[in-house]
Amino acid sequence: MATVIQNPLKALGDQFYREAIEHCRSYNARLCAERSVRMPFLDSQTGVAQNNCYIWMEKRHRGPGMAAGQMYTYPARCWRKKRRLHTPLDPQLRLCELRLEAELMAKREAPQTEATALEALLRGDGILDKRNNNAKEEETLLEIQRVLEADENGDGFHDDEDFEVDTPKRKHRNKGRGRGSGRRRTEAVANDDQDKPYVCDNRYKQKHNSKTADSVCGKRYKNRPGLSYHYAHTHLAEEEGEEERETEIPQSPPVHHENHKPQKAPDGSIIPNDYCDFCLGDSGSNRKTGQAEELVSCSDCGRSGHPSCLQFTDNMMQAVRTYQWQCIECKSCSLCGTSENDDQLLFCDDCDRGYHMYCLKPPMTQPPEGSWSCHLCQNLLKDKASGVEDP
């Protein structure tokens, strides 16, 4: 017959029980803190925008019970609107502008003093007091939310730009395949600025290193993914490299030209760079692997990269030596020669050439699943090709 344990603490032990309770409390505190600082998201099942809530209270917010059976009471918090950071985009102010236009004739006949309050509201003068009150409420809410340690919740508060991720439109391309290189054509500077509206202002180095305005990067890209990849693999890599050089023996880094423009030879050809655009190493040293590796250069913009940094396969490393390779920003269709409709570009997994799906024979409507090889690689590699083209 099983024995009945009168007190479970005797079987578990006081120390074990205290540790279990402490771990449970720590887990609940971390879970509540993580939920309180979570970014708003749209629930795909219910279609409801899940947002932050303020139901998490601390022990110091407890008050005595006000009714029978109540042990504690907590202060009630009224519903409040979000603090509006962009005053010119406030929809309430836009409504005021519409009313102002509708009553334009009446306002012209009315005295000038009647419109002073509305004009002050449109200028943003009357929002200062509201912003100060909201700032005080925000500080109170942040005190409730700070349950984690200072080093753990340091990464919890970011700007909206830190969470902004643009998904590239191009299908079936390998990760990291020359994505940070900017398109460099032989056109005029004005056309280059129009084609590439995304400019790297190097805010990170200005914020932490206090560089002057002359040290702004200024590199231009045609889309945001290219700019983001350049920022992460160039400027952040430079910051990490400076921290490593403080603890190691100083070495002469490869020359990295700011405001890079494609250098041309006397015959008009593009002079390739002598450093990798990803790890900033040269042909004698790959900073990621520490080994010597040959650089692969773009024939249009001159940017270079190590095959391992570009995640090239053995077939790609042999194929790029046989034709004028293009980086992901300069990639064009090998059949029609244009880079339009880049969302329809399909990349070969053996030679890295690009093809429009509608330029293929027969044309494709959807990218194939898995690996895909162009007709050139299928004829050359036969059975060693990565994939077989769908009929």
Swiss-Prot record:
A zinc finger (C2H2-type) spans 198-235. InterPro entries: DPF1-3_N, Znf_FYVE_PHD, Znf_PHD, Znf_PHD-finger, Znf_RING/FYVE/PHD. Residues 152-200, 236-266 are annotated as: Disordered. The keyword Transmembrane helix does not apply. It comes from the Eukaryota. GO terms for biological process: cardiac muscle tissue morphogenesis; chromatin remodeling; muscle organ morphogenesis; nervous system development; regulation of DNA-templated transcription. It is found in: Nucleus. Residues 169-183 have a biased composition (Basic residues). Keywords: Activator, Chromatin regulator, Metal-binding, Neurogenesis, Nucleus, Repeat, Repressor, Transcription, Transcription regulation, Zinc, Zinc-finger. It holds the Pfam family PHD. Its main location: nucleus. One of its GO terms (cellular component) is SWI/SNF complex. One of its GO terms (molecular function) is histone binding. A zinc finger (PHD-type) spans 273-333, 330-380. Expressed in the heart and somites. The PHD-type zinc fingers mediate the binding to acetylated histones. Component of the BAF complex. Interacts with acetylated histones H3 and H4. Component of neuron-specific chromatin remodeling complex (nBAF complex), a subfamily of ATP-dependent SWI/SNF chromatin remodeling complexes. This is Zinc finger protein DPF3. It comes from Danio rerio. The lineage of its organism: Eukaryota, Metazoa, Chordata, Craniata, Vertebrata.
